[in-house]
Design a protein with these regions (language model features):
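N-terminal hydrophobic signal-anchor/signal peptide
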Residues: 1-23, 27, 75-77, 126-289, ...
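Membrane-cytosol interface motif
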Residues: 85-89, 140-159, 306-329, 349
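A hydrophobic, helix-centered structural microdomain
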Residues: 268-333, 367, 444-477
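C-terminal terminal-structure detector
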Residues: 348, 370, 393-477
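Short, glycine-rich, amphipathic interfacial segments at transmembrane boundaries or analogous
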Residues: 167, 177-181, 240-253, 307-349, ...
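Loop-to-transmembrane-helix entry motif
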Residues: 49, 85-89, 275-286, 357
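Signature of alpha-helical transmembrane segments in polytopic membrane proteins
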Residues: 1-139, 474-477
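A short, structured surface patch at a secondary-structure boundary
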Residues: 342-403, 445-453
């Protein structure tokens, strides 16, 4: 699976996105050229089409992502594919039309604009039909041979079965040849010393080293020979990261964290990220200020108490800051016990609407402007919960290496909550983000977030409560 700025992206998605980008980009210049056929007019300045074609291509790919057209878990029929693609293209072309009204360099002639749409849209639809058929025909599962039979090996086998990636485990080898009876779906094929002939028989595409004890047992010569024959050799943490988008905290050797790539973003990445945070936050605050004033008035009229909810959260390097949200619960919610699974009576009428639309998060833009938070990063933890998590979750404080965010990798991967179990899972996603932090990954997370807000009702990642009375309750996160 190839990596884009450190983030794993399936090859079939890269080819689809590249093809779609080429179609949209080329359609703009086709739209500029076609009006010239049969006419004695001055040839257009082709350089003038570069900026709008680049922006339009970015918009189409972004809207397609928001419409879940790059979601490998989905298998749309032709009717739904056509509907989603129509929404994505219409939205993208409307945005470029509005941008062209304000920015001269993004303006397209009306005929070029229409010709671009009527050529790019059907071509993209046809591309997706052909691409879907070709990938379905060539989606042979890649064979994986596991070295090891312990907990780590079993976890990798379970992860492969649960994933939608094109892998299948053909068997495992261990030190004594007693790697299992197939009860977990994986049979033992012999000992580690049998790697040479087992590889010739099973012809694995990938050998995953999942040995919990390697000293004196790792068949180095046979592994090198397999690598020379073209077989991929993967250490199990890297393979797990590739499949899940997580760093496996529980079984990880400390040395892996020390020597693994990543965990140190380039200075230009940090500066660019901060610049984007400031520009986007300032623009959104200005544009949404009328909405925020209306929300503030509605909160005050709906229930007595302050407009904003403030809570101490842990920021980068453990610095405490006050996080802002629009208040969505009664002002006395701090002292009332959390309800059972029934709807929380402490949430106000306006609060329910704010939570459903995530508008209660808007004031956190001020935290971003002040430098306490970023648009993207691990969610800031409530200070009162940190001691418990620090004691029970390994490597927990490593998530403080970057600024917390309004949204994050864990949230778009459907992980939210304040129990130790949820926090453990969130940490694995957070560490993946910290290891592979890039502007590309930030943009991907923001697009995922927009998709969730627009198309997912009651998503668990932002179901929040503002003030628990016990550390195991969920909270305003």
């Amino acid at each position: 699976m190839p990596r884009v700025f450190g983030h794993y992206v399936p090859a079939r998605l890269l080819t689809l996105a590249a093809g779609e980008a080429a179609i949209v980009f080329g359609s703009v210049f086709l739209g500029l050229a076609l009006p010239l056929v049969g006419f004695h007019v001055i040839r257009p300045a082709w350089g003038d089409g570069f900026a709008p074609s680049m922006v339009l291509t970015t918009l189409v790919l972004s809207m397609a992502h928001i419409a879940a057209l790059y979601d490998t878990r989905q298998d749309y029929g032709r009717a739904e594919l056509l509907l989603r693609l129509t929404i994505a293209f219409v939205a993208a072309y409307l945005v470029i039309a509005m941008l062209g009204y304000f920015i001269l360099h993004l303006t397209l002639a009306r005929k070029a604009f229409l010709l671009s749409f009527v050529t790019a849209f059907p071509a993209s639809f046809l591309l997706r039909l052909v691409h879907g058929r070709l990938t379905a025909q060539s989606r042979a599962r890649r064979k994986v041979l596991l070295l090891g039979s312990g907990e780590v090996s079993q976890m990798i086998a379970a992860t492969v079965r649960a994933s939608r990636h094109t892998y299948e485990v053909v068997g495992r080898l261990d030190a004594n040849g007693r790697g299992g009876d197939g009860s977990d779906g994986v049979w033992s094929l012999g000992t580690l010393e049998d790697l040479d002939w087992v590889s010739k028989v099973t012809r694995p595409d990938v050998i995953v080293v999942a040995l919990e004890e390697r000293r004196g047992t790792l068949p180095v010569s046979e592994i090198v020979e397999s690598k020379l024959q073209g077989t991929e050799i993967e250490d199990w943490p890297n393979f797990y990261e590739k499949l899940t988008g997580k760093i496996p905290v529980g079984n990880l050797r400390p040395s892996w964290l020390v020597f693994a790539d990543g965990f140190k973003p380039a200075r230009i990445t940090v500066l660019t990220k901060r610049t984007i945070d400031l520009l986007v936050s300032l623009c959104v605050v200005v544009l949404s200020s009328p909405v925020m004033l209306l929300i503030a008035a509605a909160v005050r009229l709906d229930s007595p108490g302050p407009v904003f909810f403030r809570q101490d959260r842990l920021g980068r390097f453990g610095r405490v800051f006050r996080m802002l949200k629009f208040r969505s619960m009664r002002a006395d919610a701090d002292t009332s016990p959390p309800p059972p699974d029934a709807p929380d009576p402490r949430v106000t009428r306006v609060g329910r609407l704010l939570r459903r639309t995530r508008l209660d998060e808007l004031p956190q833009l001020f935290n971003v402007i002040l430098g306490d938070m970023s648009l993207v990063g691990p969610r800031p933890e409530w200070v009162a919960l940190v001691p418990e998590f620090k004691a029970k979750v390994p490597l927990y404080l490593h998530r403080l290496a970057v600024k917390p965010g309004i949204t994050g990798w864990a949230q778009v991967k459907n992980q939210y909550g304040a129990t130790v179990g949820n926090t453990w899972d969130k940490l694995e996603y957070d560490l993946y983000y910290i290891k592979n932090m890039s502007i590309f990954l930030d943009m991907l997370i923001l697009l995922h977030t927009v998709q969730i807000v627009l198309f997912t009702k009651g998503s668990g990642e932002w179901k929040q409560k503002q003030a628990p009375s016990t550390t195991s309750a969920s909270y305003a996160g």
